[in-house]
Amino acid sequence: MTTQKIVHTKSPDGSKLFRHQAKFVAGAMNINQIPNFSLPEIAFVGKSNVGKSSLINTICNNKNLAKVSNTPGRTRQINFFNLADKLIIVDLPGYGFANVPISVKEQWEVLISYYLRNSYSLRLVNLLIDSRRGIKENDKKVAELLLANKREFQIIFTKSDKVTDRKNLNDEAQNFLATLNYSCNVMYVSSRSKEGARELKASLAKCIKPQR
């Protein structure tokens, strides 16, 4: 792979797809419970309390779809949502949460890692980063895991309404991707203001299988 300038999505929006209702179809607390789908899967991964569930609810226009909590570590299983029989949206447990037993933390890490390495239908991973915190070491490890397994991913800076100066974040993302020798979309999104929702939907809609 060659290092390139960060790409910002300008493709047509995916609003037509996301007008449909998404529905919960499966949950997996261990690797044996992970289902196989014939539809393409798009996953959301990030540190605990980064806003994964809130973002999924925002783009799916359903505030009750994915369970949201202010308590880190609330999502304790992989949750799968079917969107119009076109896409499977995957909400992964958050990583980096310390206030759980080590055995539970290790179980989550194994579950996340196994899914990201082995899902046959996984087409795109959204690596969520809290705009207020920046890119942390465990975010880098996840990105390295994705690259090692040839997974396409994009960086999503969440809670963008909480920051005003984005130059440092842009520089950080640029340097981070350069060290990985990887080029991808970098977006700013906010579940509160809806900033970036249209661009994110457009990038996800690209993963739909072309009709024959």
Swiss-Prot record:
Cofactor(s) this protein cannot do without: Mg(2+)
Residues the entry annotates as binding GTP: 46-53, 73-77, 91-94, 158-161, 189-191
Binding site for Mg(2+): 53, 75
Single annotated GO MF: metal ion binding
Protein's GO biological process: division septum assembly
Gene3D superfamilies: P-loop containing nucleotide triphosphate hydrolases
InterPro entries hit by this protein: G_ENGB_dom (IPR030393), GTP-bd (IPR006073), GTP-bd_ribosome_bio_YsxC (IPR019987), P-loop_NTPase (IPR027417)
Pfam families (UniProt xref): MMR_HSR1 (PF01926)
Residue ranges annotated for the EngB-type G domain, each copy included: 38-210
UniProt keywords, alphabetically: Cell cycle, Cell division, GTP-binding, Magnesium, Metal-binding, Nucleotide-binding, Septation
Stretches of the chain forming a coiled coil according to its record: none
Family stated for the protein in its record: Belongs to the TRAFAC class TrmE-Era-EngA-EngB-Septin-like GTPase superfamily. EngB GTPase family.
Function noted in UniProt: Necessary for normal cell division and for the maintenance of normal septation.
Protein's UniProt name: Probable GTP-binding protein EngB
Organism listed in the record: Rickettsia felis (strain ATCC VR-1525 / URRWXCal2) (Rickettsia azadi)
Organismal lineage: Bacteria, Pseudomonadati, Pseudomonadota, Alphaproteobacteria, Rickettsiales
Gene behind the chain: engB
